[in-house]
Amino acid sequence: MKNNIINTQQSFVTMPNVIVPDIEKEIRRMENGACSSFSEDDDSASTSEESENENPHARGSFSYKSLRKGGPSQREQYLPGAIALFNVNNSSNKDQEPEEKKKKKKEKKSKSDDKNENKNDPEKKKKKKDKEKKKKEEKSKDKKEEEKKEVVVIDPSGNTYYNWLFCITLPVMYNWTMVIARACFDELQSDYLEYWLILDYVSDIVYLIDMFVRTRTGYLEQGLLVKEELKLINKYKSNLQFKLDVLSLIPTDLLYFKLGWNYPEIRLNRLLRFSRMFEFFQRTETRTNYPNIFRISNLVMYIVIIIHWNACVFYSISKAIGFGNDTWVYPDINDPEFGRLARKYVYSLYWSTLTLTTIGETPPPVRDSEYVFVVVDFLIGVLIFATIVGNIGSMISNMNAARAEFQARIDAIKQYMHFRNVSKDMEKRVIKWFDYLWTNKKTVDEKEVLKYLPDKLRAEIAINVHLDTLKKVRIFADCEAGLLVELVLKLQPQVYSPGDYICKKGDIGREMYIIKEGKLAVVADDGVTQFVVLSDGSYFGEISILNIKGSKAGNRRTANIKSIGYSDLFCLSKDDLMEALTEYPDAKTMLEEKGKQILMKDGLLDLNIANAGSDPKDLEEKVTRMEGSVDLLQTRFARILAEYESMQQKLKQRLTKVEKFLKPLIDTEFSSIEGPGAESGPIDST
């Protein structure tokens, strides 16, 4: 069979009939997935092909070899040329089959082999089970990983969440006010039934959407916003609010079909979403710029809701007792004056307001049930309104606290000026300055307000407020960002009134100034003649705080600067600048170079002194500082040495006292020990 290979190198050859011995066995082998006898030795086939290619006389070797073996036996049959194609190109029969059939055959083989092995080896069964378990565990892990997929999450501190809280608060407020009113006033329910049903089911839809929003609302875990869907859902389910939300959406409206449409009280479970309303109020209080006004309006709303509920209960009790049966209940509704829906509600609201505010002036109760209701109303009114009025009082006092504190400062300064006999003109200037601060809301101490913030946030606020202003200064234009941040934190706001001098010619320059708001004038010595007017963003005094060597002006001011009106300035002191520059030596040299260039342009720099190196005055100052520090260290050392000697003397005195006290006791103890030993005499060791 190894030589039964068709030569396909000649294209003109027609398909021959190939004699295959025992074809039934070959077909069975093919069905079982075994190698066909047509391709038992591919290597030999390929070699025979190569030999045929090399020697054309070998083309007839196939027929010759087959005849030499004696020709076909009785079981050999002829196959047509179509089946002979089955082994063309010297490849195995399996390679010509589709890949799906190969996979099926391999699976059948593996299953049959596994069955045979499992029957023989029980250990292999266990191994197989373990493999299956591992596969299941891996699948479960994959499922869990799929479940941990991140979803779109609403940030609870963002605007989207706040806007949704506003949306969910509207149906909650609707249910809290209208459900009880519709349950007590029958005309209100029956006359506008269609509108109420629309509003009811719209609010229910909003409630359902709110439950979905809760499953997409992130929360912080280790400072990071959780975005995994499964965690968000589990967090919501483990919360008490989930149970209340489910209870609030129980379809109690189905009872309408049994009881009728005049029983809206079956929707009282919708009131359980009150937490969303309170959350909205809380977030609004933190977001608004007028928190005290919002708190007062919020308390007024609570008062109105309580009075509204009490009015509805009063009307329902009157309906149960009978309208007009006595003087306490609501009058007879058959009277046209009291039969209108508006009059019913307004009368009940009036009665509720008088009762809960403990004003009285209402008809006295007649029946026992009426007495009980009035007593309960009085107790509720006393408790609730006492707390509400107390809160309103504290809010109003907090609103006036800043004004009271500011007024206390003014009163103290007035007393001081009166005690020191300050002139009336100066007193008026001081009072006007305080009035300017109060009217323009500049009484806030920035350091006091920002001291509770962390350093990073404080720096960011200072950068947002002052950095652009500081960059306008020429010498700070190209400085490092870190140095600018340090300087921004050291800027001090100052307010000057009209006619105040910021600096005068000849003054020692210890600060530089940046104009935030207002106008300053460079004036002559007479204080009237104006040379230049400085406006917002201008600055001056930057050279004096650098203490540049060779400056002809020295460290003194060269002009008179006066405030024309009220002016807001930022001040940077020399000490603060030098403290910041200790960490930035390169920036210090750069600033000095810029200052020298500015002085050279103005002709105020002595180049000989500037290029002379270190100033001897600076060296003398350093030497004097070193001497002072050495003297200080010597005095401290002498003080410590004196303290050590005094402590040593005190310790010696205490030791002598202890010796004097313990000496007689030790002598008596030794005498008592030696006494019996002396009487008994020496002991014979033998």
From Swiss-Prot:
Residues given in the record as 3',5'-cyclic AMP binding sites: R557, T558
Central gate (site feature) positions: F385, V389
Sites carrying sugar chains: N325
Transmembrane segments: 166-187, 198-218, 244-262, 268-286, 294-317, 341-375, 376-400
Region: Disordered, residue numbers: 31-75, 87-149
Residue span of region Selectivity filter: 358-361
Region span, C-linker: 401-477
Ways its activity is controlled: Channel opening is activated by cGMP and at a much lesser extent by cAMP. Ca(2+) binding concominantly blocks monovalent cation currents. Inhibited by L-cis-diltiazem.
Compositionally biased intervals (Acidic residues): 39-53
Reactions accelerated catalytically: Ca(2+)(in) = Ca(2+)(out); Na(+)(in) = Na(+)(out); K(+)(in) = K(+)(out); NH4(+)(in) = NH4(+)(out)
Topology of this chain in the membrane: Multi-pass membrane protein
Biased composition (Basic and acidic residues): 110-124, 135-149
Effect caused by changing E361Q: Renders the channel voltage-gated in the presence of saturated concentrations of cGMP
GO biological process per UniProt: calcium ion transport; monoatomic cation transmembrane transport; sodium ion transport; visual perception
Coiled coil spans: 619-673
CDD domains, A to Z: CAP_ED
Biased amino acid composition, Basic residues: 125-134
Organs and tissues of expression: Rod cells in the retina.
Pfam families xrefs: CLZ (PF16526), cNMP_binding (PF00027), Ion_trans (PF00520)
Membrane side Cytoplasmic: residue ranges: 1-165, 219-243, 287-293, 401-686
A Gene Ontology term for the protein's cellular component: photoreceptor outer segment membrane
Subunit relationships: Forms heterotetrameric channels composed of CNGA1 and CNGB1 subunits with 3:1 stoichiometry. May also form cyclic nucleotide-activated homotetrameric channels, that are efficiently activated by saturating cGMP, but poorly activated by saturating cAMP compared to the heterotetramer with CNGB1. The channel binds Ca(2+)-bound CALM1 via CaM1 and CaM2 regions of the CNGB1 subunit; this interaction modulates the affinity of the channel for cNMPs in response to intracellular Ca(2+) levels.
Comment on protein domains: The C-terminal coiled-coil domain mediates homotrimerization of CNGA1 subunit.
Summary of the function given for this chain in its UniProt record: Pore-forming subunit of the rod cyclic nucleotide-gated channel. Mediates rod photoresponses at dim light converting transient changes in intracellular cGMP levels into electrical signals. In the dark, cGMP levels are high and keep the channel open enabling a steady inward current carried by Na(+) and Ca(2+) ions that leads to membrane depolarization and neurotransmitter release from synaptic terminals.
Disease in which the protein is involved: Retinitis pigmentosa 49: A retinal dystrophy belonging to the group of pigmentary retinopathies. Retinitis pigmentosa is characterized by retinal pigment deposits visible on fundus examination and primary loss of rod photoreceptor cells followed by secondary loss of cone photoreceptors. Patients typically have night vision blindness and loss of midperipheral visual field. As their condition progresses, they lose their far peripheral visual field and eventually central vision as well.
Protein name: Cyclic nucleotide-gated channel alpha-1
Record organism: Homo sapiens (Human)
Gene that encodes the chain: CNGA1
